[in-house]
């Protein structure tokens, strides 16, 4: 029997690894939700309703975490006792810092020129970069290189932020 304190992976009876069968996750989530959905406990007592609500909330949180590769990696690292240190560890490889500066300049230049096509191209580049880095992150996590994986997570978080900024610029220019 799974308890509320077990890992997200245990809740869905999945291996605690980065590579994840999304169809198996979806099926496991639906199975758990079928068992604990509050509607099934409409006629139950308050205590049972409260427990069902806790389980449903727990299942939703676990599903959202495991469904998102970056959240899944962060969670997996936390299970291994590794804090990614996103708030206080901003040290990154010099090459990545240079890439950050280039992306920022591209955003500024394209926004100043009101060039939506350039922003679209940058967004595509960021998506490709994210995809490649997620593959590398999976390799790092599966090989137990947790500190390198933590840095990769921080880099991916930055890439997501930049992509969000690009999206906001595109939206601003198109309105």
Curated annotation (Swiss-Prot):
Keywords: Chaperone. The keyword Chaperone applies. SMART domains: DnaJ. GO terms for biological process: [2Fe-2S] cluster assembly; protein complex oligomerization; protein folding. The keyword DNA damage does not apply. GO terms for molecular function: ATPase activator activity; protein-folding chaperone binding. GO terms for cellular component: iron-sulfur cluster transfer complex. Residues 7-79 form the J domain. It comes from the Bacteria. Belongs to the HscB family. Interacts with HscA and stimulates its ATPase activity. Co-chaperone involved in the maturation of iron-sulfur cluster-containing proteins. Seems to help targeting proteins to be folded toward HscA. This is Co-chaperone protein HscB homolog. It comes from Burkholderia multivorans (strain ATCC 17616 / 249). The gene is hscB.
